Design a protein with these regions (language model features):
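N-terminal Sec signal peptide cleavage junction
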Residues: 1-5
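Flexible, solvent-exposed loop/hinge segments and secondary-structure transition points
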Residues: 8-485
Length: 485
């Protein structure tokens, strides 16, 4: 008869310290080591943890363009910058995450390339963090940069190398984004573009290895999701046939020092609704309940096993205006954009006509509902089926960043998120707002969001899980089996 072992409730990381932000000298040494690691013309960029681009460096004869997502050729400098941001945004102090890792958990199958398995938990991640802005007034010292393109306007977003909207090749990857650690804390990311997969990844790794900007990965040394070990980097030695090079290029941006640590805690002042919905005290209670549950929830994406989860929490009013935005210490930075969008999505799509047909208007939906119906196969995990009923929404969002379906354009839009971690908020049967949570596994995100929505949950009779589409039951939320242990 087996025994149940309860892992210790390890605290998760603190806020980034000022001593561990990147200096100009740090940036220069990382870029120089990367550029000299291989005799291939490349574009190299460095980001700090918040997404400020600190350097863009083009080696002599660097290609003008490089492969981005969905078969798009984009300026190589832009690709390098977004690879750097992607690695910085996804890593936490307890677990390094590269763009290879992100691709692995966002393919149309998990693990990638295994037929008749459901999609990765972060399916659709490429549609996030495209530089939309949040239409907020930050508290003093708590502002975040808008991750716009170097040229201005929407950026390429999270880069994974996904080849097309149907994800016809799960093994296609852009692995040139690697996190930078300093003093055991995430300090930023390096992105390399312009070579082949092995060269880009090696040059990015070399920029961190040569200077000791590497993580101290706790036991067991690898993050495991659903029994599957997630890859970090593959190419840690110079690729066959390549030779070391020289730093023979020039900076087109920087080198700059990071302006400071990534902010945590309340990023904006908590306020009550201007739409006749949530009061300020209710907003505060929602945030505090979410934090309290997070502090009890076992993390999936942190090491060692038994660490507690960390999240970004957003609460939105009926018009999408943010009433609260809170980042727990060491919560992943990509989660800010994601939590904000989730909080807005559940409001709009729980009342929008026709956007989620054939669900009836007024059905309470979550981002789990939206993502489940937006897969290239429906239901996810059954190959050779038709795309989901909301797949056209995914395609529209992909082509139209900083929108919210076909809602009339307004400042409170930053895209649609196609993976879980949200709940619409109700006073009785009246929709009054939305909560979005991001920062760990999607089931953990759902669990913590539901805790925040306690007392404001959607009436059971109007939830999406009352309905089936094409004979397939639609989901609402899903929780871990034993979330605290």
């Amino acid at each position: 008869m087996g025994t149940t072992v309860t892992p210790p409730k390890q605290p998760s990381g603190p806020a980034q310290t000022a001593a561990n932000v990147l200096s100009v000298a740090d940036v220069q040494s990382i870029v120089t080591a990367s550029a000299a690691s291989v005799n291939v013309p490349l574009a190299i960029a460095v980001s700090d943890r918040s997404g400020n681009i600190l350097a863009v460096y083009l080696k002599a004869n660097a290609p003008a363009t490089a492969q981005a997502n969905f078969g798009v050729q984009a300026p190589a400098a832009e690709v390098a910058a977004e690879l750097a941001r992607s690695a910085a945004f996804f890593s936490n102090d307890q677990a390094p995450i590269s763009t290879r890792t992100v691709r692995f958990i966002s393919a149309s199958h998990f693990p990638p390339g295994i037929t008749n398995t459901e999609s990765g938990p972060l399916y659709g991640i490429e549609n996030t963090n495209r530089g939309c802005g949040f239409n907020v007034t930050y508290l003093p010292g708590q502002s975040l940069p808008v991750p716009m393109a170097l040229s201005g306007g929407p950026s390429l977003g999270i880069l994974t190398g996904k080849p097309d909207a149907m994800d016809s090749n799960n093994l296609a990857v852009n692995p040139g984004g690697v996190p930078i650690f300093k003093g055991g804390e995430v300090a930023g990311g390096i992105g390399v573009a312009g070579g082949d997969e092995a060269t880009d990844e090696y040059a990015a790794v070399a920029g961190t290895l040569a200077n000791g900007f590497v993580p101290n990965v706790p036991s067991p040394g690898v993050v495991v999701v659903g029994g599957v070990s997630l890859p970090f980097v593959n190419q840690t030695t110079i690729p066959a046939g390549e030779q070391p090079g020289t730093a023979n290029g020039s900076y087109t941006l920087g080198p700059l020092a990071s302006p400071g640590p990534a902010p945590e805690g309340d990023l904006i002042a908590e306020t009550g609704s201007t739409q006749g919905g949530l009061t300020q005290s209710e907003v505060h209670a929602i945030v505090q309940n979410t934090i309290a549950t997070a502090n009890l929830t076992r993390a999936v994406l942190r090491l060692p096993e038994g660490s507690r989860a960390r999240f970004v929490i957003a609460v939105a009013d009926l018009d999408g205006h943010l009433l609260a935005l809170y980042r727990m210490p060491d919560a992943t930075m990509f989660s800010v954009d994601v939590a904000v969008a989730k909080s807005r999505n559940v409001i709009y799509f729980s009342q929008a006509p026709d956007e989620l047909s054939p669900l009836p208007q007024g059905t309470a939906v979550t981002n789990r509902t939206i993502g489940f119906g937006a897969q290239p196969f429906f239901p996810s995990g059954i190959d050779a089926t038709l795309p989901g009923p909301f797949f056209s929404l995914f395609q529209y969002d992909l082509a139209n960043p900083c929108t919210q379906g076909h809602q009339a354009a307004n400042p409170n839009q930053n895209g649609v998120v196609f993976f879980p971690g949200a709940a619409p908020l109700y006073h009785g049967s009246q929709l009054v707002g939305g909560i979005g949570v991001s920062g760990d596994g999607v089931d953990q995100d759902d669990f913590v969001a539901a805790a925040g929505a306690n007392g404001f949950a959607a009436p059971q009779a109007i939830r999406a899980d009352n309905y089936s589409v094409r004979g397939v039951p639609m989901p609402y939320q899903k929780f871990p089996r034993d979330p605290e242990n």
